A protein has these predicted regions:
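A Rossmann-like FAD-binding core segment of flavoenzymes
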Residues: 1-95, 166
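Flexible, acidic loop-helix segments that line cofactor/substrate-binding pockets
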Residues: 9, 33, 39, 137-153
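Glycine/Thr-rich phosphate-binding loops of Rossmann-like dinucleotide-binding domains
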Residues: 9, 73-76, 114, 182-184, ...
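General small-molecule cofactor/ligand-binding pocket signal
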Residues: 29-31, 105, 172-174
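A short, glycine/Asx- and small/polar-enriched loop/turn
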Residues: 41-46, 101, 187-192
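Short beta-strand and adjoining strand-loop segment in the mid-core
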Residues: 51, 109-116, 147-154
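FAD-site-proximal beta/loop scaffold in flavoenzymes
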Residues: 58-133, 220, 235
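Flexible, glycine-rich terminal cap/loop adjacent to redox cofactors
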Residues: 132, 137, 149-160, 165-276
Length: 276
């Protein structure tokens, strides 16, 4: 039961649907956009009354797991005395992770935002560079990847297709299915796809992967986006065969397959062919 939310709502709907279909095939029923009205019962016999657009419903079960999220525990720290501003979601910081007290930094979950261990590690690296070496490092949330450890896994970095279309006038969306990969076929993990969004100049804006080892496969795209690489770079490396990582190279080639379908490009190719 998702109270007022949709399942995997922050992820690309195209990829999220792959995960949700797999979950449903295992017998899990998902109620989205629901409001919990009442919880009752005894140990081993629990009732949850919910309300959705379709009406009211009572769900019965033996156990109740509550995933209510978390928020920073800032009470009793004396932040006001230290001149450190904060709000309900966390301590306020600038792009350099400096608080309103310029001598104090804050990192990780206590500042809200993306609450991942690897984000806290990333923050720590920025603070060390700023505090010890006076390097003006700043947080770039656009290069932070995340992984949803479902089966199959889902991973993402950068802009989603929807976000990219909102920000840029023209984008190209590249896809490559896992079932075209020989390693995936050999180990019977063919479910999923790679999806990459590039701008009109070929700069990589975002990447999403759903499938076996998606969390490992996304790391190349995280590097590419952080270094502002273009999609052609992803074609110029050699991937060992047979590995799942070949999908990252194959999806990059879709950029030029798409270009070849353009009428003007086809005319140029035909003209060059006549020249021999």
């Amino acid at each position: 039961v998702l109270e007022g939310l949709s399942a995997l709502g922050k992820d690309d709907p195209e990829l999220a649907s792959v995960v949700l279909d797999a979950v449903r095939r295992e017998g899990v029923t998902i109620r989205e956009g629901a409001m919990v009205q009442r919880v009752s019962g005894t140990a081993g016999a629990i009732k949850v009354e919910i309300k959705t657009e379709a009406g009211s419903e009572t769900i019965e079960g033996t156990h109740l797991l509550m995933a209510v999220g978390r928020k920073p525990n800032l009470e009793g720290l004396g932040l006001e005395k230290a001149g450190i501003d904060y709000e309900k979601s966390g301590i306020k910081v600038d792009a350099g992770l400096t608080t309103s007290n310029r001598k104090v930094y804050a990192i990780g979950d206590c500042i809200g935002g993306l609450q991942f261990t690897h984000v806290a590690n990333y923050h720590a690296g920025i603070v060390i560079r700023r505090a010890l070496f006076r390097i003006p490092a700043k947080v770039d949330t656009g290069v932070i990847p995340w992984v949803t450890y479902t089966e199959p896994e889902m991973a993402h970095v950068g802009l989603t297709e929807a976000a990219a279309r909102d920000k840029y006038s023209k984008v190209n969306v590249l896809r490559w299915p896992m079932h075209e990969n020989d390693r995936a076929q050999a180990q019977l993990t063919t479910e999923g796809l790679v999806k990459v969004v590039v701008d009109k100049r070929g700069r990589i804006l975002g990447a999403s992967i759903v499938g076996e080892n998606a969390g490992e496969l996304i790391q190349m795209w995280s590097l590419a986006i952080s270094q502002k690489m273009k999609i052609k770079v992803m074609m110029n490396w050699i991937s060992p065969y047979p590995t799942l990582s070949e999908v990252n190279k194959r999806v990059a080639y879709r950029q030029y397959a798409t270009a070849a379908s353009n009428t003007a490009v086809r005319k140029v190719i035909g003209w060059l062919a006549k020249l021999g």
